[in-house]
Amino acid sequence: CAKKREWCAKTEDCCCPMKCIYAWYNEQSSCQTTFSGMFKKC
């Protein structure tokens, strides 16, 4: 996983749950992933 503070812009960048959630919380993410998709292996 990349650092959680890195920008999460594309769906393929969001396979690490905490990274995507952290980015979304800080309004840095527009990625639309399902909860099951968030846990897929990178």
Curated annotation (Swiss-Prot):
Reported function: Neurotoxin that slows the inactivation of vertebrate tetrodotoxin-sensitive voltage-gated sodium channels (Nav) and most likely insect sodium channels presumably by binding to site 3 of the channel. Effects are an increase in resting tension, a muscle fasciculation and a decrease in indirect twitch tension. It fails to affect tetrodotoxin-resistant sodium currents. In vivo, is lethal to both vertebrates and insects.
Chief site of localization: secreted
Similarity comment: family membership: Belongs to the neurotoxin 06 (delta-actx) family.
SUPFAM superfamilies with a match to the protein in the record: omega toxin-like (SSF57059)
Cysteine pairs bridged by disulfides in the record: C1-C15, C8-C20, C14-C31, C16-C42
Phylogenetic placement of the source organism: Eukaryota, Metazoa, Ecdysozoa, Arthropoda, Chelicerata
Pfam families: Atracotoxin
Localization, UniProt: Secreted
Tissue distribution: Expressed by the venom gland.
GO cellular-component term (any): extracellular region
Keywords per UniProt: Disulfide bond, Ion channel impairing toxin, Knottin, Neurotoxin, Secreted, Toxin, Voltage-gated sodium channel impairing toxin
Protein name: Delta-actinopoditoxin-Mb1a
GO molecular function, one term: toxin activity
Comment field on protein domains: The presence of a 'disulfide through disulfide knot' structurally defines this protein as a knottin.
Miscellaneous remark of the record: In this species, the venom of the male is lethal rather than that of the female. Is the sole lethal toxin in the venom of male M.bradleyi.
